[in-house]
Amino acid sequence: MRGERPCNRTAEKRYELARDPGSGLIAAGDPFIVNTREAILKTVAEGKVPLVSPYRQFAIEGSLMSYGPDSADIFRRSASYVDRILKGELPGNLPTQSPDKFELVVNLKTSKALGLSIRESFLLLADEVIE
């Protein structure tokens, strides 16, 4: 059965996905995931399991790809809010913002290690391709 699977910390269960052809993992946008990034990337590399994350750093460090908000853009937008607050605006009067700039990073080194090919048309959509 395909779909979500609960996290299981036992070593033999870590590679359960690797035995299921066509499976992969999507990392949640969560501080725990970021803090355990090294162990997660090591586990998926050893198990040859594709991983997609919302964090650019994951793709740089070895996941298959990342797609998520552009962190630099978020920090720039946050700085403008800090500036407005320091100039006297009340934080409660500022509108809520959501990310509006997203980036796709594809790691071809990982793709090759996993034996996966990625279409050129998809690579053309990427903001960054790691070769």
Regions found by a protein language model. Give the residues of each.
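Short hydrophobic alpha-helices and adjacent helix-cap/hinge residues
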Residues: 1-131
